[in-house]
């Protein structure tokens, strides 16, 4: 992976389209697994059939709530704090105001609604 990324950097001027190396490696590894029957030969676990489309919305399983409540609270708190810090930083840089309550409501609703589609929690990401 590293050597391919270095090659992309060297040939960036000559080739206008950057090769998506990560995607190429995933496809090559999947093809190699399929062709060499690595599931049976080496005991590797293969995902199998992946259904198409978006799964229908359904309620998250409430029977595991007691097991994950503390971790979920921590993820929610850190995600909200990071998102709010970045929003306030952008507001200061571009001279606009941020309402903490509106951010809290938007962040909470987006994560609650996305839980019915079994999405991962959303939060802002701090760049370099």
From Swiss-Prot:
The keyword Transport applies. GO terms for biological process: iodide transport. Residues 1-14, 88-103 are extracellular. The chain crosses the membrane at residues 15-35, 67-87, 104-124. GO terms for molecular function: chloride:bicarbonate antiporter activity. Expressed in gastric epithelium, predominantly in the gastric parietal cells but also at lower levels in mucosal cells. Residues 36-66, 125-128 are cytoplasmic. Pfam families: Sulfate_transp (PF00916). InterPro entries: SLC26A/SulP_dom, SLC26A/SulP_fam. It is a multi-pass membrane protein. Acts as an anion channel mediating the transport of chloride, bromide, iodide, nitrate, sulfate, gluconate, thiocyanate, oxalate and bicarbonate ions. Its permeability towards bicarbonate is weak and increases when pH is above 7. Mediates thiocyanate transport in retinal pigment epithelium cells. Mediates iodide transport in the thyroid gland, playing an important role in the synthesis of thyroid hormones and the maintenance of thyroid function. PANTHER family: SULFATE TRANSPORTER. This is Anion exchange transporter. It comes from Oryctolagus cuniculus (Rabbit).
């Amino acid at each position: 992976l590293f050597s391919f990324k270095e090659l992309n950097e060297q040939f960036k001027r000559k080739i206008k389209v950057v090769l998506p190396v990560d995607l190429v490696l995933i496809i090559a590894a999947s093809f190699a697994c399929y062709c060499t029957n690595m599931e049976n030969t080496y005991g590797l676990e293969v995902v199998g059939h992946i259904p198409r489309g978006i799964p229908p919305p359904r309620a998250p399983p409430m029977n595991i709530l007691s097991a994950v409540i503390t971790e979920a609270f921590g993820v929610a708190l850190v995600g909200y704090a990071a998102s709010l810090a970045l929003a306030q930083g952008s507001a200061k840089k571009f001279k606009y105001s941020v309402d903490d309550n509106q951010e809290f409501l938007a962040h909470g609703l987006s994560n609650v609604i996305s839980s019915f589609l079994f999405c991962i929690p959303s939060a802002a990401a701090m760049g370099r």
